[in-house]
């Protein structure tokens, strides 16, 4: 499944970081895009909320959104990671944000880091679905979009206002946060 959307306009930023940059956003699912199915009493996927989030956040960046899968990251396989890697490789943009489930985000970051040089890739997600009013997703997406504009090429994880290199991050399941493995 692949859907493209273009969002953004000239924000009058002029010269400087990100002034002429287009950011590619790849949607892969995860808690970020889950919704509560009242009939089944479960969380499921209906559609991505990324475009709505960008509008709500009054984002003025030029972005191209592509939904490449809607998957719980616990169900993600090496084949899915290869699909994400191929999408990153084939896109023209050098600044990429990937929305991803938090359970295996670090594994995907590791897989991408093995294959990429010259592009800045930032993975982000949410602990609570955006469809729930208390989600951290909007903040995390905004943070990732900011980080991707200023970081050196490489692979990163951005969660809850912090940004980590792919090889120095873990999900602390007890605290429900991402943290550096070595400070």
List the predicted regions and their residue ranges.
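Intrinsically disordered, low-complexity terminal tails and inter-domain linkers enriched
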Residues: 4-19
